[in-house]
């Protein structure tokens, strides 16, 4: 059984429903972090493979890193978390493979495009490396930063052959491309500064940076 699945969403909730309906393996807790709740009156579809669906309606966009962190904080007793994009489709034995290959000491990436469209992260990884850097708001470079920090900490970052169908950049195509054009460079510069300064910290969220990089 998948102990915890965390799925943030901002737009295209129809693709989230498609993802939920594609689940074909037992999931204990599915946590949906609905960053588009102000604009969409959404109710998740039912799937018999999921023991419990938790739907958090967020009044503004937390962004990727903050959403992933919130998922971990909401289900802190899980041995590991499967974090997934909303626009993937599960099929075959992909979820079973994640269950069999994941453990508390590992960061396991999918074979989707990109590989971070679904990944599992163990509690001992979070304990050693920390949470994702919420200064990288709302999207991009949070995965690069975390993988870099894991490697510095000697954590096993494992590629896999776990297949996954993924409609890449669904959020940007839903009307956020222009805003991303503004924030992408800000995040690229922030990430490069961390590299230049050999900064392996989890960063610091700030209200000024949050407002500057707003997609709201």
Model-derived features with residue positions:
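Short beta-strand-to-loop acidic/aromatic patch adjacent to the donor-nucleotide binding site
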Residues: 78-89
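A conserved acidic beta->alpha catalytic loop
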Residues: 33-43, 87-89
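Glycine-rich, basic loop-to-helix element that forms the pyrophosphate-binding segment
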Residues: 58-75
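Short, well-formed alpha-helical segments that are part of the catalytic scaffolds
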Residues: 11-25
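C-terminal catalytic/acceptor-binding lobe
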Residues: 142-216
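Conserved donor-nucleotide/metal-binding helix-loop-beta segment in metal-dependent transferases, i.e.
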Residues: 93-110
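A recurrent flexible, glycine/aromatic-enriched loop bordering the glycosyltransferase active site
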Residues: 106-124, 128, 138-139
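Short beta-strand/loop segment that forms part of the nucleotide-sugar
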Residues: 28-37, 56-58
